[in-house]
Regions:
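N-terminal hydrophobic/helix-forming segments and targeting peptides
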Residues: 1-304
Length: 304
């Protein structure tokens, strides 16, 4: 059965053989921007939604969607966008004060933009530029956490197509608002033995995860994840030959973090496929996606 909360969280219940119930989540919201104001010359000034790496937006195509359903295309640009004109085109800082959205409409002033129906508070969507390579890589913005959502959907597909009844009952959540800090905060953890958030795994610096692995997070900036549950996930990887790494993320929080902050009394863990260049032009590998799916199936008791 499936229900959707007033906040927008989708909850799916999966019947299992036993009485023990576990939770899974992935978030469907992602990064973007919002119209903050319109300049006298018709340029859209914006505020970011979530922690996108702003310099990577310079030159990116986007769409502005109005509240009455209209969509307009545009481009994120520096306020010094032309090498033939501006001395500081290379050095000018890329931030909200020094960037804008150029609309693909004949606008010369703020009134021209308003006549299109564009208002403060309208969302701005960034082009994902999604590609699947012959070598198995997936290149796209917002694999955080579209990859995690796809992995949970694949678990549902496998259970249905293979007619598998998992050992454990499962409550699966697709959350929103994770990128702004409160995605899973309203989830009722009553009756859950444990809870695993499926999000991107970090790649880079001294971390041992690659894009082909599933990353099991031991700790992030919100604190350590449940020691016993994390160890159990590692044991599943060892038992089933799943390529994995255990990592400590220096800058991160998850749906489990939001649940704990809200007072949920449940053991929580965090896993996900290795994703390179997070919150920028991200990349993972299908091997990492498949390893994550295998670990999820093992966790709910659906992998031989």
């Amino acid at each position: 059965r499936c229900t959707v909360s007033p906040k927008g969280t989708c909850e799916i219940f999966i019947q299992g053989k036993g009485k023990e119930t576990v939770g899974l989540s992935a978030h469907c919201d992602t990064l973007g921007a919002m119209v903050r104001s319109v300049s006298p010359s018709g340029e859209i000034m914006f505020a970011t939604v979530g922690g996108i790496i702003l310099p990577t937006l310079d030159g990116e195509y986007c769409r502005v969607r109005t509240r009455d359903g209209k969509t307009f295309t545009g481009t994120f640009l520096s306020r010094s966008p032309a090498i033939h004109v501006f001395d500081d085109c290379v050095t000018r800082k890329r931030d909200e004060k020094n960037m804008y959205v150029r609309l693909d409409e004949k606008v010369c002033c703020a009134d021209d933009v308003r006549r299109l129906g564009i208002r403060n508070g309208d969302y701005i969507f960034v082009d994902t530029k999604t590609e699947f390579t012959d070598s198995g890589f997936v290149k796209s913005r917002f694999l955080d956490d579209k990859a995690g959502a796809a992995e949970l959907l694949t678990v549902l597909h496998v259970l249905k197509e293979e007619k598998i009844l998992p050992e454990k009952q499962v409550k699966m959540f697709f959350t929103v608002y994770e990128e702004v800090g409160h995605g899973a905060s309203a989830i009722d953890a009553t009756g859950l033995e444990s809870f695993v958030a499926v999000d991107m795994g970090c790649v880079g610096d001294d971390l041992s995860c690659t894009e082909s692995m599933v990353s099991v997070c031991a700790k992030d900036r919100s604190g350590p994840y449940d020691y016993e549950l994390t160890g159990r996930l590692v044991s599943f990887c060892e038992k089933h030959g799943i390529d994995y790494a255990v990592n400590v993320y220096p800058h991160y929080s998850s749906d489990v973090s939001a649940m704990r902050t809200a007072g949920a009394d449940v053991a929580g863990a965090l896993i996900g496929p290795g994703v390179q260049a997070s919150h920028g032009m991200e990349r993972t590998h299908l091997d990492g996606v498949f390893n994550t799916i295998k670990l999820l199936l093992a966790y709910i008791g659906a992998l031989d």
